[in-house]
Amino acid sequence: MIEIIPNLFIGDQNDYESRVSRQTGWAVVHACKEPYHRQALGYKTRGAPRNHPEYLMAKRGDRLILNLVDVDDPSFIASEIVDTALQFIEDSLSNGIKVLVHCNQGESRAPSIGLLYMANKG
């Protein structure tokens, strides 16, 4: 887990499970479908039902859970997912809350969202 700017951390699933999940004072962006989006919605099929109101993302307290898979083609990623994640990060940081953005391995989805946040901030 690394801090890329003050109070914004990028990591992997293990960082969340072993370091953040049991602490208070954190907001978390789960930038991975498995297992968090599946657990939040409770679906047993390969993917979430497309007509579910939380198909793209679910918010549970200080956790934003994205239906985000690791794909090579960015056209498969809904801009609404990215926009919501960036706003969630901004809102959390503005309220003095530390934020962890994580994916399964911490090598693509989470760092990409962190870089997009930094690029948008200028």
What are the residue ranges of the model-derived segments?
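A short glycine-rich, hydrophobically flanked beta-strand micro-motif that places a catalytic Asp/Glu
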Residues: 101
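Active-site-adjacent alpha-helix immediately C-terminal to a catalytic or transition-state-stabilizing loop
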Residues: 104-122
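Cysteine-based protein phosphatase catalytic domain of the PTP/DSP
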Residues: 2-98, 119-122
